[in-house]
Amino acid sequence: MFRYESLEDCPLDEDEDAFQGLGEEDEEIDQFNDDTFGSGAVDDDWQEAHERLAELEEKLPVAADEQTGNGERDEMDLLGDHEENLAERLSKMVIENELEDPAVMRAVQTRPVLQPQPGSLNSSIWDGSEVLRRIRGPLLAQEMPTVSVLEYALPQRPPQGPEDDRDLSERALPRRSTSPIIGSPPVRAVPIGTPPKQMAVPSFNQQILCPKPVHVRPPMPPRYPAPYGERMSPNQLCSVPNSSLLGHPFPPSVPPVLSPLQRAQLLGGAQLQPGRMSPSQFARVPGFVGSPLAAMNPKLLQGRVGQMLPPAPGFRAFFSAPPPATPPPQQHPPGPGPHLQNLRPQAPMFRPDTTHLHPQHRRLLHQRQLQSRNQHRNLNGTGDRGGHRVSHQDHLRKDPYANLMLQREKDWVSKIQMMQLQSTDPYLDDFYYQNYFEKLEKSSAAEEMQGDGPKKERTKLITPQVARLEHAYKPVQFEGSLGKLTVSSVNNPRKMIDAVVTSRSEDDETKEKQVRDKRRKTLVIIEKTYSLLLDVEDYERRYLLSLEEERPALTDERKHKIWSMYDNLRGKLPGQERPSDDHFVQIMCIRKGKRMVARILPFLSTEQAADILMATARNLPFLIKKDAQDEVLPCLLSPFSLLLYHLPSVTVTSLLQQLMNLPQSATAPAPSNSHLTAVLQNKFGLSLLLILLSRGEDLHSSDPTVESTQNNQWTEVMFMATQELLRIPQAALAKPISIPTNLVSLFSRYVDRQKLNLLETKLQLVQGMR
């Protein structure tokens, strides 16, 4: 796991004057704590206790070499009678269940004995496992107190979970426990800033504490120090002073000031006195299993004894993060450095107490800590993949309001601002600005007249001189603007509606009203005619159910309703000889009207139905244009086919002339007939034309009594229809709905064989129909 085989090979960054420098810094008066908590926050004289502690540190090497009871007696003399009993009882506090753990005892027995090196301070005491066997007996033999002095003096705290996800800076600052005027609390009182009394945590960190408050120097030189060692290897952390692996929660330049009792207990652990714990046993205490203190070199532990302890409950008034609870160590086979396998150090997180700060100051401090943490993550390769790592400077330089507007929007705003500066009448557009600069110019002119100093030239705003076009104001008109898209421009950035106003004359409005009224009348006629049609269709049922004497009246009623339907379709006015086709065309332009005509034709007489067919043939191109979307005209083909078998040859010839838009007399037609072209390009028109040609050919070939004049008319009409079919391109020719069977013999009488084959190809005649 590490580059070195043992902790002894790890290089130590230890200064010889560490204790001396620590003592010199402790001698300085902490003005910050005095201003915050008052001068009466400490019950005893801490300077005198610190001087005794400094003398104890000087006598530490001598006391470590003797291994007798003299060192303990000298230490007790320095600390005094009151602290002697307390320190001795605190140092004997060992959890019995943890010492009886077979995993812990096996790790103690299998640990190899390290060879002491010259120059080390009693390395056998720290590394030898035999010492643990000698002191284990006295430790277990002595009676463990049920409630220790520390548990009695300090507040009880419940077990706390990990507080990484909780913002500790939001906790309220507790009340001050002392007052500079009233005085100090008794020794057994709660330290300053300690939370209310709660359940105690059974950890070694709480057992080694002193009930006296701990003075901590504020981190003044580095205002917001960044946490060390988030992504560094343990070997690198060993070489970094005050790193998080060493358990030092303070900033690098601020060492903690421990109480005399804590310092005496830690330094006194180096002597092999009965009831005291060696660093080897100290590292195996359950509170330190898995902590950075257990994975250190004994020399490093001995040299950094005043800095390696994690913050105890006394420190939690300022560092409010409790020590993390770690599971008991697992069993590993013996090998080189078993303590490195059993104990995996984890760097504690530094969380300062900021309850004494202003809420806005706390929020700023929290943001800077997050930025510093992200910086270390990016530097150690924990950022985004693919090289998309942003430096801390770029992160701080990032504008939160960047990229909120497109370049087009920025140019838009700039143009609007520049347009506001373009003015032909500045006093009207910007009165206050002009008056302000006039006052400035007057004051500057007065100063120039009085003083002889250099003239001051004031910067003036230079506006672009662009001619402004005056636009006549037109209020927005909402009439006819429904469904229009909104249009935005520089002049009208929030234009609500782009209204299109069209002025119409009275004649146009009159015509539009007439068309609208005409369509409404047509719809009313269609509904009335449909009611008559339903009554006529229900006549047979009523006729069978009626009595014999009621049937003549029903027959007359049926005839009357059929005439009414025909009159509604044709729109014949009283006294008018021939009805107009306009009314019928209006009905045929509506889909419901076309379906209604197809249902009415079987009930009409032959003359009435022939008149409907004639009107349809005359206006077929217009009806085809109106039927392009509905395509309902093919429903009329079946009733028209049945009607053609009841019409004479003269009527069929006249109907064909109406369909082809030919005059009644035998005259030469125009070379191009748009009417016939529109009929041939529609499937209903082409199918109706082929049916008329087939029915007319049958009538003229089977009736020898037909006059020669009628035969000549028929021959001329057939010749014109054949020429038009040959002229129109095949792609423009529509596909007919049905093709008569006698059509090939019909065309063979009027064209040659080559043209007949071309007609067959165009009309897609199937083989065998010849």
From Swiss-Prot:
Where does the record place the region Region N?
Answer: 85-388
Q: Which intervals of the chain are annotated as region Region A?
A: 1-84
GO CC terms in record: CCR4-NOT complex; cytosol; nuclear speck; P-body; PML body
- Write down which residues bear the modification named Phosphothreonine: 178, 194
- GO molecular function annotation: poly(G) binding; poly(U) RNA binding; RNA binding
Transmembrane regions: none
Positions of the UniProt region annotated as Region H: 389-448
InterPro entries for this protein: Pat1-like, PAT1_dom
Which residue ranges does the record annotate as region Involved in RNA-binding?
A: 223-397
One GO biological-process annotation of the entry reads:
deadenylation-dependent decapping of nuclear-transcribed mRNA
Ranges for region Disordered: 1-42, 320-341, 369-394
- Check the UniProt entry and state the signal peptide residues, or none: none
Query: Which residue stretches belong to region Involved in nuclear speckle localization?
Result: 398-770
UniProt keyword Cytoplasm present:
yes
Q: Which residues carry this modification: Phosphoserine?
A: 177, 179, 184, 278
Q: Which residues carry this modification: Asymmetric dimethylarginine?
A: 217, 223, 263, 284
Q: Which residues carry this modification: Omega-N-methylarginine?
A: 385
Residues annotated as region Involved in nuclear foci localization? 1-397
Motif window: Nuclear export signal = 86-95
What the record says about family reads:
Belongs to the PAT1 family.
What does the protein in this record do? Answer: RNA-binding protein involved in deadenylation-dependent decapping of mRNAs, leading to the degradation of mRNAs. Acts as a scaffold protein that connects deadenylation and decapping machinery. Required for cytoplasmic mRNA processing body (P-body) assembly.
Its protein name is Protein PAT1 homolog 1
Whose protein is this, by species? Rattus norvegicus (Rat)
